Amino acid sequence: YKRQIADTLGAYAKEKGVTLCFHPHYGTCVFWESDIDYLMAHTDPRYVSFCIDTAHTTLAGMSPVELIKKVGPRLAYMHLKDVDTYALKTAEGADKMGTFRALGHGTIDFPAVKAALEEIGYDGILCVELDRPEVGNFHSAEVSRIYIRDVLDI
């Protein structure tokens, strides 16, 4: 019945011009690679898409680059968020959310993420997400904007 619910919601959303998009996220029912694989195998790609979040993908022990390639044409939305995997090794529970960083100040290989997005022909939205910035919202947004412009050339 779960597949039927997702496909039914996705079909209804599509009729209304909206894309049903699952965002694998820490602390939710769709987070681990096995959850994503199950959802991909048991839902209709015409109706169920994905939002990949680079940091949450990393928290789940996956490579954002490999997940982008796996999801391929089902990728409808993209969250760019950095994470410090060194701090993540000692973080427990909700403290894992405190390991997020401004773009370029964590350990995610964003040039490789950009290359994977280009490889699958993704031309959708890239949303920079800053959860619990270390210094402050404005500073973290500015640092991330500079990184996107100067390093990723976006």
Predicted features and spans:
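Active-site acidic/histidine proton-transfer and metal-coordination neighborhood
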Residues: 2-50, 138
